[in-house]
Design a protein with these regions (language model features):
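Protein kinase glycine-rich loop
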Residues: 5-6
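A conserved alpha-helical element in kinase catalytic cores
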Residues: 10-12, 18-98
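Active-site acidic catalytic loop and adjacent metal/ATP-binding pocket
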Residues: 12-16, 114-158
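ATP/Mg2+ or Mg2+-diphosphate-binding catalytic cores
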Residues: 214-256
Length: 256
């Protein structure tokens, strides 16, 4: 049976064996239960949890398609097209609506991510529904993987990650005359496709999300002994996100 180490997996080692994915995790019983719930609800485009292998790794079904990094560079037009923006929004709406039924179980705790915000809760957040975790087939969104960071939360909190990494212009080549109108259009397209109004403070929500999840939580986990988060600090990921936050504070108003 063919074995292939998959690209990505910044937090866990990921190996494809045959048609399934074997992932080394720290043990996420609530995430496993949530994926089984989504399967029962008939939600397509998400991995199915199949059990554990002889090494104790989680086994998931493989989602065929292309992803950012192995197949697309971060600035590939496909990833930032109007179609992709709307596809991601519709996918997140489908996922969030289905997840509401899991809330009574979810609020009992036991999630792998201990840093989720206080209630009230509306749905189950994917936790890292950024563009690099979506799967594309024929340049259209076909699925979403890496549910290890899932936790109870609000819709807008989860959408902040998806929106910011897909529709917001990059800070390193930003030109308001070229990028501001496109960003404004795509932000509106995103929320129209999701079916909820764009909150007037969406830029602030994104800033809070990036600051908390991508900066503060990474530092806290590294301090607690998480080796992968320590690698992220060494690699300079926090500096990238801090620059992104400064970019949002300076230019975000131009997109509203």
């Amino acid at each position: 049976m063919e074995t292939k180490i998959l690209s990505g997996g910044s937090m866990n080692q990921v190996v494809k064996i045959g048609e399934n994915v074997h992932k080394t995790t720290k043990g996420h019983p609530m995430v496993r239960e949530y994926l089984l719930y989504l399967e029962k609800e008939g939600v397509t485009g998400v991995p199915r949890f199949l059990g554990l292998d002889e090494q104790g790794r989680d086994i998931f079904t493989y989602l065929p398609g292309k992803t950012m990094g192995p197949d697309y560079p971060a600035d590939h037009p496909c990833l930032h097209s109007d179609e992709a923006i709307c596809d991601m929004a519709r996918f997140m709406r489908k996922l969030h609506d289905a997840a509401v039924g899991f809330l009574p179980r979810a609020v009992q705790g036991g999630w792998a991510n201990p840093y989720f915000p206080d209630g009230p809760y509306e749905t189950i957040c994917h936790g890292d529904a950024a563009i690099w975790n979506f799967v594309f087939v024929d340049n259209r969104v076909a699925g979403l993987f890496d549910f290890e960071q899932a936790y109870p939360g609000t819709r807008y909190w989860d959408l902040a990650s998806t929106l910011s990494m897909a529709a917001f212009p990059f800070y390193f080549d930003y030109d308001a005359s070229k990028h501001a109108e496109k960003a404004k259009r795509q932000i509106n397209l995103f929320f129209d496709a999701y079916g909820m109004p764009c909150p007037p403070d969406i830029i602030d929500i994104v800033i809070d999300r990036v600051q908390r999840d991508f900066c503060e939580d990474t530092v806290a986990r590294a301090a607690a002994g998480d080796k992968e988060c320590a690698k992220m600090l060494t690699r300079g990921d926090i500096k990238h996100y801090q620059k992104f936050i400064a970019h949002l504070k300076k230019h975000g108003h131009e997109w509203m």
